[in-house]
Amino acid sequence: MKSKHRFIQACFRQPVDRTPIWLMRQAGRYLPEYRKTRAQAGDFMALCKNTELATEVTMQPIRRYGLDAAILFSDILVIPEAMGMDVRFATGEGPLLDPPVRVHGDIEKLIHTDPEDSLDYVMRAVASIRKALNEEIPLIGFSGSPWTLATYMVEGGSSKTFGLVKGMLYDAPESMHLLLDKLADMVAAYLNAQIRHGAQAVQIFDTWGGVLSQPTFREFSLRSMKAVVDRLDRTNSAGERIPVILFAKGCNAMVEDIAQSGCDVVGLDWTSEIGPLRERIGHKVALQGNMDPALLYASPERIAQGAREVLQAFGPHPGHIFNLGHGMAPDMSPDHVEALVRAVKEEGLKIHQGVA
């Protein structure tokens, strides 16, 4: 069954009328309407857990920009919370997780819960957003990768050195594998629940895969992501195929390995040229990306030029979803995002109509 949505078509490398665009963190603090809604919620996790408000912030960039896909508004750290950890977001400090997972016994205490129960607020949001979208564009569900989740759980929050989690990886690999296996089980169950409730594509964010060497990335990150992909429901109850996107920041050198994971789309950061990467793996998977997010600090004219450069580098071939190479930052201009979306739509149409 072929989808009517150009985003889904592009995920499966089918012909499209123009290149689809969505943006990581497209719902966020750079939007004044988001800041107003977050203030109404009280704090970030309260916003994630309020069905009406989570739906509202998901829809805000769709109404403003006419993007080609919506992405569920939530946070990757809902999984550690569901497994028994206390997760809070301290102002100016980022996430704090307590108690941190430091030894084998800590890992054994983590509980595998049914996301239909422990993360029921996410499922309500998925269903609510699907209704609000009214089938006009598809909804992307998401999760953090097992490795990225493990970094927060072992470090107890964000880290610059990743000393604790890497120490476990090197000194106690059996403990790290147990943690990653538990997380892979939970991530797969979580994404399958999102699919049951209406997610039409899913993305796994491996934000911290790039801090690993290539051998350790294969063993400790990619292996666990593949375990998740292998367990995902790739067709929903309506008979629609569900594309799977893997985005591993800082891992463009590993694209061949990632393309063999079973995913449909490989997300790229901005550090490599998309044209040569398409030549290497574009016959296997679609590619998502990969404009430097910092271009949004430039003038609208330079932003449009940057968008054209990415689109022209990929060319008129099937299988490209335009995105940034990482998420939106809070201090980016909504007007500059509008200039980007407009440029991608105009140039993406020309490329696929053969007039670029």
UniProtKB/Swiss-Prot annotation:
Site features described as Transition state stabilizer, chain residue numbers: D75
CDD domains, per the entry: URO-D
Record pathway: Porphyrin-containing compound metabolism; protoporphyrin-IX biosynthesis; coproporphyrinogen-III from 5-aminolevulinate: step 4/4
Keywords: Cytoplasm, Decarboxylase, Lyase, Porphyrin biosynthesis
SUPFAM superfamilies: UROD/MetE-like
Annotated InterPro entries: UROD/MetE-like_sf (IPR038071), Uroporphyrinogen_deCO2ase_HemE (IPR006361), Uroporphyrinogen_deCOase (IPR000257)
Catalytic reaction list: uroporphyrinogen III + 4 H(+) = coproporphyrinogen III + 4 CO2
PROSITE patterns: UROD_1 (PS00906), UROD_2 (PS00907)
GO cellular component labels: cytosol
EC number from the UniProt entry: 4.1.1.37
Gene3D superfamilies in the cross-refs: 3.20.20.210
GO molecular function terms attached to this record: uroporphyrinogen decarboxylase activity
Superkingdom field: Bacteria
Location in or out of the cell: Cytoplasm
The protein's assembly and partners: Homodimer.
Stated family: Belongs to the uroporphyrinogen decarboxylase family.
Biological function: Catalyzes the decarboxylation of four acetate groups of uroporphyrinogen-III to yield coproporphyrinogen-III.
Protein known as: Uroporphyrinogen decarboxylase
